[in-house]
Amino acid sequence: MASGILLNVKEEVTCPICLELLTEPLSLPCGHSFCQACITANHRKSMLYKEGERSCPVCRISYQPENIQPNRHVANIVEKLREVKLSPEEGLKVDHCARHGEKLLLFCQEDSKVICWLCERSQEHRGHHTFLMEEVAQEYHVKLQTALEMLRQKQQEAEKLEADIREEKASWKIQIDYDKTNVSADFEQLREILDWEESNELQNLEKEEEDILKSLTKSETEMVQQTQYMRELISDLEHRLQGSMMELLQGVDGIIKRIENMTLKKPKTFHKNQRRVFRAPDLKGMLDMFRELTDVRRYWVDVTLAPNNISHAVIAEDKRQVSSRNPQITYQAPGTLFSFPSLTNFNYCTGVLGSQSITSGKHYWEVDVSKKSAWILGVCAGFQPDAMYNIEQNENYQPKYGYWVIGLQEGVKYSVFQDGSSHTPFAPFIVPLSVIICPDRVGVFVDYEACTVSFFNITNHGFLIYKFSQCSFSKPVFPYLNPRKCTVPMTLCSPSS
């Protein structure tokens, strides 16, 4: 009898929201009491969904926050009640509907909620499939147990992925640190000459390290979060499995579907065999090339371009830059107008000369050809302005016709134009050039007395691309630039650059 009374008292001091004994109870003007944390959370939901209106979760009577009062009397009852020990059978928890006050005995399959018999007859659950909690609890217990095993397996996989990414991160750090040490050691021998190269290489490695470690750190964080998420889900399921039937069934279908549809996110990794590996250059060869380039650069002249009436190239206002355009020749016939591209060779249409003639001495200049897929440059004995449609076709690019040039076509094919053979005198002998590093800037050196024209790959430490010897300079020669069909401009570099 006394135990029954205690159960009734316990029911009276149970929070209608969390269904636990009241903690720091607060009473509303309507007389209902709630845990401080529960009614505060209810405040937030009311503010979010009901535009500031607050109402009692039990009777729906509106109230103002300032009217909420701590209920010390109820708090004292709860403290005394916690000291009383009930027998297991008498202590069985009886849960009631917060809306209707009736016992929660049914489970709504559509909403995954434990409800009372009045809820079942309400509009909210009308037509839904409802079962006694005892009928479905075992079924969902098995489903949750299966989901728990699946989740534990995925947790093991997640932990392995986390460990793998940590190991790879450490490996990358060691590898890149090792590479940086090697780079510094290799460049120490020629510090004065290769300072800029070492700095560039280290910057690349730093950037590589930054990018890779940043990506791996991000992946590591994601793996940690993923593992933590698994732990939280497992903890939630374990709590459900150890709790009451109502706790087990509340939202159970959604949790099971979320676990079944869950896929582990794999971290982004990098393949070490695909990365750029540093190779120490031929330091002696680089030193020789550097000395040669340093020597010819003493003869750097400030070259500008000379506009003419033959070329269809576009020359910039500063006379240092030239780009191509598609020329049009318009033919007028009685009553008609036809416009179509020029029939002249496109190479000819875009070739221009430097304004400075070379008749003696040594002369050097550099041309920026970065991002171009086609170009021709070198020296020329000057245009032969006869007719626009029969001059400087491709066969004209021969030393015997006054052209000492090299060129690029299709972005990767570097060639030098030599004199044609006796069998094909009107066609140049085009010799492929082996260029390991594509030049963004090409240096041209003319030694008039020695009758040589040399081309240097400035991008590759001044590597000699090609050298014409025994050139027959019978008259003044000029710098020659031809942007060809590529619309990206060619630019003459100033000596100060």
Curated annotation (Swiss-Prot):
Ranges for domain B30.2/SPRY: 283-497
Sequence positions bearing N-acetylalanine: A2
Coiled-coil residues: 137-225
Zinc finger extent (RING-type): 15-60
Enzyme class: transferase
Principal location class: cytoplasm
Post-translational modification: Degraded in a proteasome-independent fashion in the absence of viral infection but in a proteasome-dependent fashion following exposure to restriction sensitive virus. Autoubiquitinated in a RING finger- and UBE2D2-dependent manner. Monoubiquitinated by TRIM21. Deubiquitinated by Yersinia YopJ. Ubiquitination may not lead to proteasomal degradation.
Positions that bind Zn(2+): C97, H100, C119, H125
GO cellular component, as recorded: nucleus; P-body
Catalytic function, reaction form: S-ubiquitinyl-[E2 ubiquitin-conjugating enzyme]-L-cysteine + [acceptor protein]-L-lysine = [E2 ubiquitin-conjugating enzyme]-L-cysteine + N(6)-ubiquitinyl-[acceptor protein]-L-lysine
Pfam family, one: zf-RING_UBOX
GO biological processes: activation of innate immune response; autophagy; defense response to virus; innate immune response; positive regulation of canonical NF-kappaB signal transduction; positive regulation of MAPK cascade; positive regulation of NF-kappaB transcription factor activity; protein K63-linked ubiquitination
Function noted in UniProt: Capsid-specific restriction factor that prevents infection from non-host-adapted retroviruses. Blocks viral replication early in the life cycle, after viral entry but before reverse transcription. In addition to acting as a capsid-specific restriction factor, also acts as a pattern recognition receptor that activates innate immune signaling in response to the retroviral capsid lattice.
Quaternary context: Can form homodimers and homotrimers. In addition to lower-order dimerization, also exhibits a higher-order multimerization and both low- and high-order multimerizations are essential for its restriction activity. Interacts with BTBD1 and BTBD2. Interacts with PSMC4, PSMC5, PSMD7 and HSPA8/HSC70. Interacts (via B30.2/SPRY domain) with HSPA1A/B. Interacts with PSMC2, MAP3K7/TAK1, TAB2 and TAB3. Interacts with SQSTM1. Interacts with TRIM6 and TRIM34. Interacts with ULK1 (phosphorylated form), GABARAP, GABARAPL1, GABARAPL2, MAP1LC3A, MAP1LC3C and BECN1.
Free-text comment about domains: The B box-type zinc finger domain and the coiled-coil domain contribute to the higher and low order multimerization respectively which is essential for restriction activity. The coiled coil domain is important for higher order multimerization by promoting the initial dimerization. The B30.2/SPRY domain acts as a capsid recognition domain. Polymorphisms in this domain explain the observed species-specific differences among orthologs.
Protein name as catalogued: Tripartite motif-containing protein 5
Gene this protein is translated from: TRIM5
